[in-house]
């Protein structure tokens, strides 16, 4: 056994390593040295500054914060489990390697914010938005509580931090949803801030430690198997703090976005299509039944943005939207006629089962499928003027053989999202799909085709219990 490795492990573990510990941990010596040489005084100072700036009303003293930090950096001395030691080393390495650049930088002087003149007061759109939502408000109110509705008291503090984070890291992190629309229209209320970023795991681990060191309470990261590259941070009462989708850099580059007050948000045109698509998901219609007014102001803001940005006239005149679609129950495939538009395909096969799509793409022997990850929740393949894609929401039926217009429009919106992501033609179909929302009567739901059931285990990062599962 190497004397230098043995000495390093001895100093780190606070005891002489066993032979098993030596052989299992010797590959981690470089990381261990990085942890041991880490300037914890500077780190403690950064945490205190983060606390003062973003968590000022939380009652924890500087000495308590220091104790929480020092205790964690000595945690390896209280276990002999190799699995736990690996977890502690991995998490400590992430902290010492990335915290300063990810969250510590937020304590330095803020760069100048270039105030945006993009503000919308969509008074004229509220009536249109209200009428649209009234016509699709066809679900009954559900009493089940979704995880996104069970929010932590820490959300306000984390939102304050996120506003600064989005400005400092606007090349790698963008936002969408209610907060992004609040930046366009300050009358919109928001809860947590929805984000897409290229280093989601590192960010959330650092944030988890910041909260733990300030509050002294455990927080936990969960990876959900049925959402691609998604992680959620929950507090010690299992309440939602923040979640984040991770995307590759090339996907981030493809996302249409606009800059408001030094923060990049997903282009509201794309967000409008996403909203139309999500109305096909029965859960979202149940949310609408609970609070139509909340959705009205969001939709009105999106419509006003699109009207001004693209010069779209809202008069209800439309002939080709939603695109004609039929459903094959046995194959669980929606077939869409896209021939009326200037697309690179004439027909779309929209699969409700992702594995079936993957299998058929393999059979086609095609290797040019494009994956936009959770931005579209699907790959897209164009082959012989046919699009192959996956739709991750429920499909609503208005009769046994007829797709409900809400879902037909949702599928059409999904296809238009591809057009925008690939810089294809979309203005005429965009105008059509928006106008297809207007002057409609309610159509009851006859049947609901369930969405794809994803299997798999939840991944967990539990700092308190030294657990990382994938």
Curated annotation (Swiss-Prot):
Matching Pfam families: Pox_polyA_pol, Pox_polyA_pol_C, Pox_polyA_pol_N
E.C. number: 2.7.7.19
Keywords, alphabetical: ATP-binding, mRNA processing, Nucleotide-binding, Transcription, Transferase
Reactions mediated catalytically: RNA(n) + ATP = RNA(n)-3'-adenine ribonucleotide + diphosphate
Superkingdom as given in the UniProt entry: Viruses
BP GO terms, sorted: mRNA processing
Active site: 192, 194
A molecular-function term among this protein's GO annotations: poly(A) RNA polymerase activity
Keyword Translocase in annotation: no
Main EC class the enzyme belongs to: transferase
Family: Belongs to the poxviridae poly(A) polymerase catalytic subunit family.
Subunit-level organization: Heterodimer of a large (catalytic) subunit and a small (regulatory) subunit.
Task of the protein: Polymerase that creates the 3'-poly(A) tail of mRNA's.
Name recorded for this polypeptide: Poly(A) polymerase catalytic subunit
Gene that encodes the chain: PAPL
């Amino acid at each position: 056994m190497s004397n230098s490795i043995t000495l390093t492990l001895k100093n780190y573990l606070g005891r002489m390593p066993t032979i098993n510990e030596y052989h299992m941990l010797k590959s981690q010596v470089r990381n261990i040295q990085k942890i041991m040489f880490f300037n914890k005084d500077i780190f403690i100072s950064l945490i205190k500054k983060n606390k003062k700036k973003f968590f000022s009303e939380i009652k924890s003293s500087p000495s308590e914060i220091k104790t929480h930090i020092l205790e964690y950096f000595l945690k390896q001395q209280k276990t002999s489990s190799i699995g736990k030691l690996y977890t502690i080393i991995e998490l400590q390495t992430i902290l010492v390697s990335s915290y300063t650049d990810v969250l510590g930088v937020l304590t330095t002087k803020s760069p100048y914010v270039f105030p945006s003149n993009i503000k919308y007061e969509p008074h004229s759109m509220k009536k249109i938005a209200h009428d649209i939502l009234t016509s699709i408000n066809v679900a009954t109110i559900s009493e089940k509580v979704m995880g996104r509705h069970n929010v932590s008291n820490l959300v306000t503090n984390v939102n304050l931090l996120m506003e600064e984070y989005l400005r400092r890291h606007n090349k790698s992190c963008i936002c969408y949803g209610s907060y992004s629309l609040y930046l366009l229209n300050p009358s919109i209320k928001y809860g947590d801030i929805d984000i897409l970023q290229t280093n989601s795991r590192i960010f959330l681990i650092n944030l988890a430690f910041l909260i733990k060191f300030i509050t002294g309470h455990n927080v936990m990261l969960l990876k959900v198997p049925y959402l691609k590259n998604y992680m959620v941070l929950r507090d010690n009462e299992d309440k939602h703090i923040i979640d984040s989708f991770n995307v590759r850099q090339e996907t981030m580059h493809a996302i249409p976005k606009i800059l408001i007050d030094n923060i990049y948000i997903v282009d509201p045109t794309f967000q409008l299509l996403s909203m139309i698509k999500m109305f096909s998901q029965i859960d979202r219609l149940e949310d609408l039944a609970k609070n139509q007014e909340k959705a009205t102001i969001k939709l009105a803001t999106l419509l006003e943005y699109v009207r001004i940005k693209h010069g779209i006239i809202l008069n209800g005149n439309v002939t080709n939207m939603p695109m004609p679609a039929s459903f094959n129950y046995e194959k669980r495939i929606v077939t869409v006629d896209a021939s009326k538009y200037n697309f690179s395909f004439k027909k779309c096969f929209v699969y409700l089962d992702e594995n079936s799509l993957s299998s058929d793409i393999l059979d086609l022997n095609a290797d040019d499928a494009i994956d936009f990850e959770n931005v579209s929740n699907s790959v897209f393949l164009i082959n012989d003027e046919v699009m192959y894609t996956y739709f991750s929401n429920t499909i609503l039926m208005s009769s046994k053989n007829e797709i409900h217009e809400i879902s037909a429009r949702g599928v059409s919106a999904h296809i238009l999202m591809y057009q925008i992501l690939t810089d294809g033609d979309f203005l005429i179909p965009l105008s059509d799909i928006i106008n297809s929302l207007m002057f409609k009567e309610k159509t009851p739901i006859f049947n609901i085709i369930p969405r794809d059931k994803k299997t798999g285990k939840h991944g967990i990062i539990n700092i308190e219990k030294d657990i990382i599962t994938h």
